[in-house]
Amino acid sequence: MDIEHNSRKKFYRFPFGAVTCGGEVRLRLAVSGAGIPSAVRLVYMEDGKGEVRKDMPYIFDVGDHCIYSVNVKMPEKAGLVWYYFELETERGMVYYGNNSKQLGGIGEMCFNSPSNSYQITVYNEDYKTPDWFKTGIAYQIFVDRFCNGNENGEFLGNRTDIIKRNWGEQPFYKAEQFGGEYKANDFFGGNLKGVIKKLPYLKDLGISVIYLNPIFKAYSNHKYDTGDYETIDPMFGDEETFKELCSKAKEMGIRIILDGVFNHTGSNSRYFNKYGEYDSVGAYQSKESPYYTWFRFMDWPDVYESWWGMTTLPQIEEHSEECRKYLLSDKDAIVKRWIKNGASGWRLDVVDELPGFFVKELRENVKKADKDAVIIGEVWEDASNKSAYGERREYFLGKELDSVMNYPMRRALIDAVSGRIDVEEFDARLMSIKENYPAPAYYSLLNIITSHDVERIMTRMGDAPSR
């Protein structure tokens, strides 16, 4: 017996890909050879619910194949629908599901209930993403390493606790050179004036979006240890310089996206204030601190949840109403404030470590500040079916993200160019993303070949086999 269903061909599944709530999907199965089944059924289920079986009547022949077909109405509530096929034959039950790589397209026959089902993403009809982002070319800037805009090349900020690098020096840092601890306190002196200075160059490159790594006040060079969400790091400039950057960039058709680090702050911050360097009363200093509920202490003050065990990055308690008001919903909340100051969107750091309710509230408030602002998430896998911390993520159902960083494309591209996969698998990987992502999200993907979190592409391809 030969069985075929190809989720990428409209003959077998129509319409292709993700669909809106309440829409209808036609599914077909082709069967040929000995042992024509006495019954063919579609088995489908909404995410987290039980299986539903629906008979698939024979409708016509195509060559030697008998075609079975059924129409299924998708749920009114956004979510994922999974399906496979079961056939009753004279030799027993036969099943047909997604392939073992779970990439969609042509599936596989088996004699036990398949572990891999096909996916249909069902999203809200009002899901819209900014048009300006869909056709843009983005350029990522790690501010300290980009350009020093001061004519004399001096460092801003007057800090005395840093290691100053020469601009042409190799950014190589051995922890043992500095007491055995990596403090991320070596700086090259890049600043926002430097970004402004390079805007004509970026425009000539065809850039229409600049994604800035974190720029708020923090101890480290990378600034993922936020010290103060309200203040541009003095080594980079100030609020007026940021406004000038956004204004001049817009004049050149370039928009600025900020890195939003809302899963954790720095231990050296106005909110935690472990070292007493801020004039606030931090959560580490007193249980009466206005920020005490922002963090998760197991044994105050020294034992607390932190990002991946890094005690310099105490984890935020997103259930704290006061924290969410400050970051998200107050009139001058952080996500609104910087949009009003000229930013055109946010890239959310480690978004899979933010609970869904937090991301939904963030989207609601960002879109209030600017309905055309973009919200991009850091997700490393297929973002349509991602599960994290026991929660199925709902990034693309219409209430959370506009899109994500396209790490799956990067991996597929590197594997293909390196000769690790053939062109058929390369195509299958990319088509799987197109099949699973709603069109508004798919056409807003931040397609990358490198980022600050992975090896630079020139380094990565150094081990590519010669062709």
Where do the language-model regions lie?
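Glycan-association/targeting regions that enable binding to alpha-glucans and other polysaccharides
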Residues: 1-135, 139, 369
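Short, flexible loop/turn elements at secondary-structure junctions
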Residues: 31-33, 46, 60, 74-76, ...
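Substrate-binding/active-site clefts of carbohydrate-active enzymes
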Residues: 142-208, 215-341, 362, 368, ...
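Short conserved micro-motifs at the rims of enzyme active sites and ligand-binding pockets
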Residues: 150-153, 387-388, 416-418, 458-461
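Short alpha-helical segments and helix-capping/turn motifs at coil-helix boundaries
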Residues: 24-27, 69, 121-127, 195-198, ...
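Active-site-proximal helices and loops of the catalytic beta/alpha 8
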Residues: 246-255, 264, 269-280, 334, ...
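Hydrophobic faces of well-ordered beta-strands that scaffold small-molecule active sites
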Residues: 137-139, 210-212, 256-258, 346, ...
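Active-site-proximal substrate-binding groove within the catalytic cores of carbohydrate-active enzymes
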Residues: 431-467
